């Protein structure tokens, strides 16, 4: 009877160890997946910042330069004081 109790205690201990190891592995997996999801979200936010901030500002800068060059091409020359 004592031997059966010893085997049962050992079995419970081994099962407890297995459950503990599985729980630790699951916890590590959850932490790693959360970190990777956070990293991916940061990358997506940087891409959105590029789309919403950087690209329009470059577009506005280029259009402004085009309008400035066009204006300089079509504006009449400055009159000299003698011509007035």
UniProtKB/Swiss-Prot annotation:
It comes from the Viruses. The chain crosses the membrane at residues 19-39. InterPro entries: E_protein_bCoV, E_protein_CoV. One of its GO terms (cellular component) is membrane. Residues 40-80 are intravirion. The keyword Transmembrane helix applies. It is a single-pass type III membrane protein. It is found in: Host Golgi apparatus membrane. The keyword tRNA-binding does not apply. Signal peptide: none annotated. This is Envelope small membrane protein.
